[in-house]
């Protein structure tokens, strides 16, 4: 009798233990590493009134070959599609669910970025390298179309504003970006962004353009992705839908160089607990000379278009390798004259690595004002083609009004800044939709204002995000659970008591 009862209790105990998973927080499909909420953990100060960001600053120059791994980047999705080797970093798509990507652990506030890239060949496959801020400023260094062997795109976005289709420029090149490595780079300063192909400038974007320039710290990202079958606009832009039976598709990256023009430990900005807005500050250092502060969120809706907004300050430079000039915002077929900036020494080729590793200061400034020397320089004629259909005018975000507390000094020293020095009172926040502009049509993704939950075990590439009382503060689900231990102990104790009672 007792033996039968004991056998029953043992079987019951086994059944109870089998019902507990190894990790209660583990998803049903643990093998799928393609989807990641890695970037979803970042809060947007222009969208979330409880968001105050403190981003890790680079504050120096770095070089990575990617031959033996990476010190400054984290894999954010499709781990199986990321490899390091003699040709540097390789991102590979094997099926429609793959999207291999890496994000830097640091941010820069103005500077130089350059990498050697060989794009992935394949219809509907896009090789991309870009910079992006927490509040959705963005500079697309390059987007390479797998279906187009002689063209690449440059682009930019300000605070997620993609209501017009006139930001992208398309550059022809020879030889193909799909058959061999080419250097793609940008130099970002407060008044000018210059895109480079093989050490030669191919596009220059000045502050007077109607959209403005990025004014927030940005991280770097490499990504290889395929267009979705049900997105007709993106399919047309990418040259067709991907055929995965023709894969795998591989993008190669090597010899990355990055220089942060600002010097700091962290970059902080966003919403304070009392509802005030904290302008960008460089903790433990200073912001680059000439920095233009972003407007607080409450000012965005008050901006009105001005005649100055119509100034075309975006020029595509022709070269022997690229005879076709990309689409611009004017419908006038005539040509305009462009005077190269006088600060030509800031557009020379990159220093050798030995020089890069020194502490020599490099201003990288671009003087956009005409000078006597400029009058002696040759004039480059820039043809202007027809604009894209559907282009509409939109109020500018970063250049319509002067910053309320802009520091006019040469260098904005922030070491001993007081809390109220660069603060604006704000009571509203902006809900921003991230809409990616394409060649034909647009793809829209709405970012939710709620704090997402993460199941990713990757190290996050950003430093600190503040959540205030009343908000959900749990960002990550713990990989170690005490539920199983507690439940197991309770069952064991109960079984022991039953056995003791039966034996007495």
UniProtKB/Swiss-Prot annotation:
Propeptide stretch(es), residue numbers: 480-504
Feature: compositional bias, Polar residues: 316-329
Domain GH16: 19-270
Glycosylated residues (UniProt): 34, 161, 407, 416, 425
Chief localization: secreted
The keyword Ribonucleoprotein is annotated on this UniProt entry: no
Disulfide bonds: 43-51
Coiled-coil ranges per UniProt: none
Domain of life of the organism encoding this protein: Eukaryota
Gene3D superfamilies: 2.60.120.200
Functional description taken from the UniProt entry: Dual chitinase/transglycosylase that plays a role in cell wall architecture. Chitinase and transglycosylase activities are coupled. Required for the polysaccharide cross-linking at the septa and the cell wall. More specifically, transfers chitin to 1,6-beta-glucan in the cell wall. Plays an important role in fungal pathogenesis via its functions in cell wall assembly and regeneration, filamentation, and adherence to host cells.
Annotated protein name in UniProt: Crh-like protein CRH12
Species name: Candida albicans (strain SC5314 / ATCC MYA-2876) (Yeast)
Gene: CRH12
């Amino acid at each position: 009798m007792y033996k039968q009862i004991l056998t029953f209790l043992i079987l019951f105990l086994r059944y109870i233990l089998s019902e507990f998973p190894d990790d209660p927080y583990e998803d049903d499909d643990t093998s799928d590493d393609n989807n990641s909420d890695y970037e979803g953990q970042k809060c947007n100060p222009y969208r979330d009134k409880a968001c105050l960001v403190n981003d890790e600053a680079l504050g120096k120059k770095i070089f990575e070959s990617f031959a033996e791994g990476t010190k400054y980047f984290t894999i954010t999705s499709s781990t199986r599609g990321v490899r390091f080797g003699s040709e540097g970093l390789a991102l590979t798509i094997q099926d429609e669910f793959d999207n291999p990507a890496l994000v830097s652990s640091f941010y820069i506030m103005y500077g130089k970025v350059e990498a050697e890239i060989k794009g992935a060949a394949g219809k509907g496959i896009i090789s991309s390298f870009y910079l992006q801020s927490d509040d959705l400023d963005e500079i697309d260094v390059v987007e390479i179309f797998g279906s187009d062997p002689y063209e690449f795109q440059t682009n930019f976005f300000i605070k997620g504003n993609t209501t017009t289709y006139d930001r992208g420029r398309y550059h022809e090149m020879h030889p193909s970006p799909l058959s061999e490595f080419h250097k793609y780079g940008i130099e970002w300063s407060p008044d000018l962004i210059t895109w480079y192909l093989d050490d030669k400038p191919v596009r220059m974007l000045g502050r007077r353009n109607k959209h403005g320039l990025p004014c927030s710290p940005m991280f770097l990202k490499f990504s290889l992705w395929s267009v979705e079958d049900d997105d007709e606009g993106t399919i047309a832009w990418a040259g067709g839908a991907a055929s995965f039976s023709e894969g795998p598709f591989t993008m190669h990256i090597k010899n990355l160089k990055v220089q942060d023009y600002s010097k700091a430990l962290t970059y902080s900005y966003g919403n304070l607990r009392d509802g005030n807005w904290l302008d960008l500050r460089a903790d433990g250092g200073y912001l680059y000379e000439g920095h233009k502060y972003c407007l607080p969120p409450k000012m965005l809706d008050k901006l009105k278009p001005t005649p100055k907004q119509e100034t075309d300050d975006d020029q595509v430079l022709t070269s022997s390798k690229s005879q076709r000039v990309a689409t611009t915002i004017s419908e006038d077929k005539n040509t305009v004259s462009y005077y190269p900036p006088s600060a030509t020494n800031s557009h020379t080729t990159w220093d050798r690595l030995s020089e890069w590793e020194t502490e020599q200061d490099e201003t990288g400034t671009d003087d956009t004002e005409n000078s006597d020397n400029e009058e002696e320089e040759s004039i480059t004629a820039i043809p202007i083609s027809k604009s894209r259909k559907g282009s509409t005018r939109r109020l500018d975000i970063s250049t319509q009004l002067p910053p309320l507390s802009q520091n006019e000094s040469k260098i904005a020293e922030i070491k001993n800044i007081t809390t109220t020095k660069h603060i604006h009172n704000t009571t509203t926040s902006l809900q921003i939709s991230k809409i990616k502009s394409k060649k034909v049509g647009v793809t829209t993704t709405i970012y939710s204002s709620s704090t997402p939950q993460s199941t990713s075990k990757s190290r996050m590439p950003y430093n600190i995000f503040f959540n205030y009382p009343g908000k959900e503060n749990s960002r990550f689900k713990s990989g170690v659970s005490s539920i199983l231990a507690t439940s197991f102990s309770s069952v064991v104790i109960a079984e022991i008591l039953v056995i003791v009672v039966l034996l007495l």
